[in-house]
Amino acid sequence: MKAIKIAIDGPASSGKSTVAKIIAKNLGYTYLDTGAMYRSATYIALTHGYTDKEVALILEELEKNPISFKKAKDGSQLVFLGDEDVTLAIRQNDVTNNVSWVSALPEIREELVHQQRRIAQAGGIIMDGRDIGTVVLPDAELKIFLVASVEERAERRYKENLEKGIESDFETLKEEIAARDYKDSHRKVSPLKAAEDALIFDTTGVSIDGVVQFIQEKAEKIVDMS
């Protein structure tokens, strides 16, 4: 049976990562968290106080402490920078609020996209992000673009933060998500947009299981036809 490449794109908190992880597990595919890679680069910038004028220093740190993924005992994914476990650190609000400017840096995107394509070559992979279907994997056999209302996405982020023990204000989250949408869709390099051949799916009011079922059925149909 042929293993395909699946690209899932969409704005912040549209359910991309949650859905991608479940589908990867169900299909026996590899899940590559591209967002965690950009968050890791952002974490480096913030930890060292680097600005957008010091891209070379961020890249140098990425080379010294490469991003890697490992599995925890419970099956969840751990993110490492070198030997440092940054799984929780990269989900903090300061990283979330700064990831747009770091991910917009052409040199950072070029390096991380190169790594992502190399990993995806063999197929049997599912990636989520903001430019997977348009830039990273334009040859993906299945491209999905998830959308949802700002209200619903803020609610999801609020619940996620509670589960992780991170304090947050609901109204502030709404403002931050709306601001992130604007930044991501208006940046010069790889702006957030659906690929021309992507299936657009509004997840507002749809359960995670419903989204998973929709995407998985599409994937299985493509595999059966190939």
Swiss-Prot record:
Catalysis performed (reactions): CMP + ATP = CDP + ADP; dCMP + ATP = dCDP + ADP
Cellular component terms (Gene Ontology): cytosol
Transmembrane residue ranges: none
Gene3D superfamilies according to UniProt: P-loop containing nucleotide triphosphate hydrolases
Subcellular localization: Cytoplasm
Single GO biological process annotation from the record: nucleobase-containing small molecule interconversion
Record-listed E.C. numbers: 2.7.4.25
GO MF, one example: CMP kinase activity
Positions of ATP binding: 10-18
Listed SUPFAM superfamilies: P-loop containing nucleoside triphosphate hydrolases
Keywords: ATP-binding, Cytoplasm, Kinase, Nucleotide-binding, Transferase
Nucleotide-binding is among the record's keywords: yes
UniProt family annotation: Belongs to the cytidylate kinase family. Type 1 subfamily.
PANTHER family (UniProt xref): CYTIDYLATE KINASE, CYTIDYLATE KINASE/PANTOATE-BETA-ALANINE LIGASE
HAMAP family: Cytidyl_kinase_type1 (MF_00238)
Family matches, as NCBIfam families: cmk
Protein name: Cytidylate kinase
Lineage, broadest ranks: Bacteria, Bacillati, Bacillota, Bacilli, Lactobacillales
